Amino acid sequence: MNEVLEVIKNRRSIRKFQEKAIDDEKINIILEAGRWAPSFANTQPWEFIVVKDKKIKEELVVATAHDSIAQAPISILVIVNPEVDRMHHIEDGAIATQNMALAA
């Protein structure tokens, strides 16, 4: 079977995290997967922000109401700029996010 399809079928949502640091090499692989995502007219309207700081993650919990952010060793924020492409920026950001989720 196609390797990509296998990864898609075996993807899991993780809600409990270990208190173990994630290697920068692994983080870079995840970010690279996001950078390789397709986007409308190659506009790449995204920016990825890696958050490791516990205090900032706690502020993100308050802002998003997602408690699991505080327990995760890192969070990767996907920011999309509607000024780059007003019609497709949300979809482009979602595709980049999916690439990173599959790489993780």
Question: Model-predicted segments: where are they?
Answer:
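Short, intrinsically disordered, charge-balanced linker/junction segments flanking boundaries
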Residues: 100-104
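A broad, low-specificity signal for short, low-complexity segments enriched in glycine/proline
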Residues: 5-13, 35-40, 98
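Specificity-determining recognition surfaces
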Residues: 1-26
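Glycine/small-residue-rich phosphate/adenosyl-binding loop
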Residues: 28-32, 36-96
